[in-house]
Every structure is written in structure tokens, then in C-alpha cells.
Amino acid sequence: MKKLTKTHSHRQQKLASIINEALIEILRRGKMLDTRLFDCPLTITKVIVTADLKIANCYFLPFNTKLTIDEIMDALNNSKNAIRNFITNKINMKFSPDIRFYYDHGFDNAIKVAHLLKDL
């Protein structure tokens, strides 16, 4: 019988937690980041690490910013090496995972559902 939900190993969850905390810290400090991120408050909503621990998918949500999602993605990708180096110093592993950033559509989807329910 197949499992309906995908479970993550303890190592995946632990690494995701460490990466999440490191991302929050480096975004708060702002050192070595693209200057466009200085006035762009971001929330890291979740981090999902692949089973082989080589890729960390990081989902973010911006608040009160004049930048577009594409500009924020570009700024995060420009800062990716500095972020990855910072994370490498936080973890004790042979390899540091590749960091990939994605806009979290969860909030937008929740608003759409709320509007649909309101219209019923």
C-alpha cells in the first residue's frame, strides 16, 4: 500500500531547520547581500531539503516592498553564493546543499479561496 504523504527523514528536517535559521540570520544582518534586499523584508516560509541532501528549496514571502517578485528572485540569486557560504559555516557536512529560491504562493491561494467562499 502506498503512503499518501511523503515523510522526510530526521536528517532532512534537521538540515532544513538549520538552513531556515541561517537564512533568517543572514537576511537580518544583510551582510554580503544584494543591496536591493536591504529594504525588502522577507519571511522564509519553509525550507524543503531533498532526500539526497543536495538541494534545499527555500520558499519566501515578501512584505511591504516596491520590488517585484522577479526582482527579489534576481537579488536572492545574486546573493546565493554568499548565502551558501554562510550556511556551509553553520553545518558540519561534507557538501553544502544547492540553495534554490521560490516564491510561496500559499498566501495568495488562501486569499483566492477566501474570496471564493465569500462569494458563495
From Swiss-Prot:
<keyword id="KW-0963">Cytoplasm</keyword>
<protein>
    <recommendedName>
        <fullName>Ribosome-binding factor A</fullName>
    </recommendedName>
</protein>
<dbReference type="GO" id="GO:0043024">
    <property type="term" value="F:ribosomal small subunit binding"/>
</dbReference>
<comment type="subunit">
    <text>Monomer. Binds 30S ribosomal subunits, but not 50S ribosomal subunits or 70S ribosomes.</text>
</comment>
<dbReference type="InterPro" id="IPR000238">
    <property type="entry name" value="RbfA"/>
</dbReference>
<comment type="similarity">
    <text>Belongs to the RbfA family.</text>
</comment>
<dbReference type="GO" id="GO:0005829">
    <property type="term" value="C:cytosol"/>
</dbReference>
<dbReference type="GO" id="GO:0030490">
    <property type="term" value="P:maturation of SSU-rRNA"/>
</dbReference>
<dbReference type="InterPro" id="IPR023799">
    <property type="entry name" value="RbfA_dom_sf"/>
</dbReference>
<comment type="function">
    <text>One of several proteins that assist in the late maturation steps of the functional core of the 30S ribosomal subunit. Associates with free 30S ribosomal subunits (but not with 30S subunits that are part of 70S ribosomes or polysomes). Required for efficient processing of 16S rRNA. May interact with the 5'-terminal helix region of 16S rRNA.</text>
</comment>
<dbReference type="InterPro" id="IPR015946">
    <property type="entry name" value="KH_dom-like_a/b"/>
</dbReference>
<keyword id="KW-0690">Ribosome biogenesis</keyword>
<dbReference type="InterPro" id="IPR020053">
    <property type="entry name" value="Ribosome-bd_factorA_CS"/>
</dbReference>
<dbReference type="Pfam" id="PF02033">
    <property type="entry name" value="RBFA"/>
</dbReference>
